[in-house]
Amino acid sequence: MKTLVVALGGNALLQRGEALTAENQYRNIASAVPALARLARSYRLAIVHGNGPQVGLLALQNLAWKEVEPYPLDVLVAESQGMIGYMLAQSLSAQPQMPPVTTVRTRIEVSPDDPAFLQPEKFIGPVYQPEEQEALEAAYGWQMKRDGKYLRRVVASPQPRKILDSEAIELLLKEGHVVICSGGGGVPVTDDGAGSEAVIDKDLAAALLAEQINADGLVILTDADAVYENWGMPQQRAIRHATPDELAPFAKADGSMGPKVTAVSGYVRSRGKPAWIGALSRIEETLAGEAGTCISL
């Protein structure tokens, strides 16, 4: 049986602008898990998820209790792994004919000298109105940036260097478990064992995981059903197949597609195995080459 690493898009957990309630997340997860469950019957499956809204909410809750020093961001990432991993595991385990589902709290090594620490760009937390920027920055010391028509907090997002728990993940996969891991991009730590005040991009973490466990494929799921040429224009066209070199211009694109293209291209070049970008609702068609974008050499 082949091994797939699947990175869930944020819409699998929460739709943009939705309240960060457990009820909303369970409802979205319930829509996502049937397709994942079908995959789990044909592949050894490692599932990576994001945590941007959730870790931002935990940070807000953390700041609200003034009598305790706020927890650092790496601890909050670990908390979000437990919360989201539990929700996904509960929903997946309820699907018929599911193999065992296990959540692994995952640490990922980053460099303390990564230039991302000097230029925070990773969105976390709920969305705000642009006119709230000055008050939020003054109240919390945050850095804020526009995310579409909304405003969100940004934090450092260093490059993942090594997944410290990959051996455990690989062992569980070989034993037939569906493994939920590298949640929120993994808990960022440095080589001296210290946690790091950052959030790692989950697509880059998924690509690194696929490399380290020698997965047979990497699937990055997103709101868009493929990578498009001339996106948003009348002549837009879905790209069904491309090499990493052909997709290179898209790695510099604004928005969320750039990191996804960077992630899949790095994996394909490193391992020579295919990767796909597509929509969760069409994941089986994407793997069959009937939807999405396949990236290979």
UniProtKB/Swiss-Prot annotation:
Disulfide bonds: none annotated. It is an enzyme of class 2 (transferase). It comes from the Bacteria. Its main location: cytoplasm. GO terms for cellular component: cytosol. GO terms for molecular function: ATP binding; carbamate kinase activity. It catalyses: hydrogencarbonate + NH4(+) + ATP = carbamoyl phosphate + ADP + H2O + H(+); carbamate + ATP = carbamoyl phosphate + ADP; hydrogencarbonate + NH4(+) = carbamate + H2O + H(+). Keywords: ATP-binding, Cytoplasm, Kinase, Nucleotide-binding, Transferase. InterPro entries: AceGlu_kinase-like_sf, Asp/Glu/Uridylate_kinase, Carb_kinase. It is found in: Cytoplasm. Pathway: Nitrogen metabolism; (S)-allantoin degradation. One of its GO terms (biological process) is arginine deiminase pathway. SUPFAM superfamilies: Carbamate kinase-like. Its EC number is 2.7.2.2. Belongs to the carbamate kinase family. Kinase involved in the anaerobic nitrogen utilization via the assimilation of allantoin. Catalyzes the transfer of a phosphate group from carbamoyl phosphate to ADP to produce ATP and leave carbamate, which spontaneously hydrolyzes to ammonia and hydrogencarbonate. This is Carbamate kinase. The lineage of its organism: Bacteria, Pseudomonadati, Pseudomonadota, Gammaproteobacteria, Enterobacterales.
